[in-house]
A protein has these predicted regions:
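Periplasmic OmpA-like peptidoglycan-binding domain that tethers envelope proteins to the cell wall
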Residues: 150-222
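C-terminal motif of bacterial Sec signal peptides marking the signal peptidase cleavage site
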Residues: 15-18
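Short, low-complexity, glycine-enriched hydrophobic/amphipathic alpha-helices that associate
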Residues: 22-88
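Stable alpha-helical elements in mature extracytoplasmic
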Residues: 39, 43, 85, 89, ...
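Second-shell loop/turn segments in exported
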Residues: 75-79, 116-124, 159-162
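Periplasmic peptidoglycan-binding/anchoring modules of Gram-negative envelope and division proteins
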Residues: 92, 116-151, 178, 208-210, ...
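Amphipathic, membrane-active segments
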Residues: 82-114
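Sec-dependent signal peptide recognition
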Residues: 3-9
Length: 223
């Protein structure tokens, strides 16, 4: 129960921060009452259907989506569907800093931490909103996929700090996409901390590569 509460609180904070405006005279950050009521409630409610941490239940998500009337993919249609989705993501994300990689029938989006977040923060950089908006458009168009969002860090800092930061970053990205009307029931959200590096942590360049959020898109099937 406490874990779920912490996630909801984080999403509420993210949603309000994302819609704050700056007073041109005082420089103070302000949030309108409409933002509190509309955005905060919508995002919190949407995230309720997502799976947060723990063991991934692909079957549960598959049943939820198929039960909601989303048709499953089968046979040769799987590869064709993912090919089309990959092509559109590649086109929309060109020059964004986000890489699009195909692994079998899955698609992996790698979002580097240095362009997605400020240092030691889970607040998404405002300049990255347009990139996430493009991702959300494709995810809504291709709704026959499950979405795994995993946060990663480098090895600087304690294991616990890195785990918590990676979780918060994954949740921030997922919350933003859900706030753009991507179905929360498709999501599995987890932080891996420093446990899954893709480069050495012995150099600044390697550590920069390891600080990232990955989105894995898997076809919705009945198996």
């Amino acid at each position: 129960m406490m874990k779920k509460f912490a996630v909801v609180a984080l999403v509420a904070s993210f949603g309000l921060t994302a819609c704050q405006t700056q007073d041109p005279y005082t420089g103070e950050q302000k949030t309108s009452k409409a933002t509190y009521g509309a955005l905060g409630g919508a995002v919190i409610g949407a995230l309720g259907g997502a799976l947060i941490g723990g063991g991934d239940s692909t079957d549960r998500r598959q049943r939820a989506m198929i039960g909601a009337g989303v048709g499953a993919l089968a046979g040769g249609g799987i590869g064709y569907y993912m090919d089309k989705q990959e092509a559109e993501l590649t086109q929309r994300l060109r020059s964004s800093g986000v890489s699009v990689t195909r692994v079998g029938n899955d698609i992996i989006l790698n979002m580097p931490g240095n362009v997605t977040f400020a240092t030691d923060s889970s607040d998404i950089n405002a300049k990255f909103y347009d990139v996430l908006n493009s991702v959300a458009i494709v995810l809504k168009e291709y709704d026959k996929t499950l979405i795994d969002v995993t946060g990663h860090t480098d090895s600087t800092g304690s294991d616990q700090y890195n785990l918590e930061l990676s979780q918060k970053r994954a949740q921030s990205v997922a919350a933003y996409l859900i706030g753009q009307s991507v179905d929360s029931r498709r999501f599995y959200i987890v932080g891996a901390g420093e446990a899954q590096p893709i480069a050495t942590n012995d150099t600044p360049q390697g550590r920069e590569q390891n600080r990232r959020v990955e989105i894995r898109l898997s076809p919705l099937t009945t198996s």
